[in-house]
Amino acid sequence: MSRSSKKGPYVDIKLLDKIEAMNKANEKRAIRTWSRDSTIFPQMIGHTILVHDGRRHVPVYITENMVGHKLGEFAPTRFFRGHGGKKADKRGKVK
């Protein structure tokens, strides 16, 4: 179920304040955040935000197509390494 339309989109206030301050100063530097549930606003376009994935911060460059999505969508938390497949023989040769 999605968020109620009467509430409006959620964005972390501290993150939005940092973005607006950087826009006023006309500077571009990476912002580190743990707020994966924040919605991407048009003011964020052109900035790089380091989104935490549980282990490290993943750099996410915000483009126009990302507006309306959540920051966490662009920093995956689970990495699929593949299913079993053919196991190597003790001699090191696959048959």
From Swiss-Prot:
Keywords linked to the UniProt accession: Ribonucleoprotein, Ribosomal protein, RNA-binding, rRNA-binding
Gene Ontology CC entries for this record: cytoplasm; small ribosomal subunit
Tagged with keyword DNA-binding: no
GO BP terms: ribosomal small subunit assembly; translation
GO terms for MF: rRNA binding; structural constituent of ribosome
The keyword Secreted belongs to this UniProt entry's keyword annotation: no
SUPFAM superfamilies documented for this protein: Ribosomal protein S19 (SSF54570)
Xref: Pfam families: Ribosomal_S19 (PF00203)
Record InterPro entries: Ribosomal_uS19, Ribosomal_uS19_bac-type, Ribosomal_uS19_CS, Ribosomal_uS19_SF
Gene3D superfamilies named among the record's database cross-references: 30s Ribosomal Protein S19, Chain A (3.30.860.10)
Role noted for this protein: Protein S19 forms a complex with S13 that binds strongly to the 16S ribosomal RNA.
Family, per entry: Belongs to the universal ribosomal protein uS19 family.
Name of the featured protein: Small ribosomal subunit protein uS19
Organism: Chloroflexus aggregans (strain MD-66 / DSM 9485)
Origin organism lineage: Bacteria, Bacillati, Chloroflexota, Chloroflexia, Chloroflexales
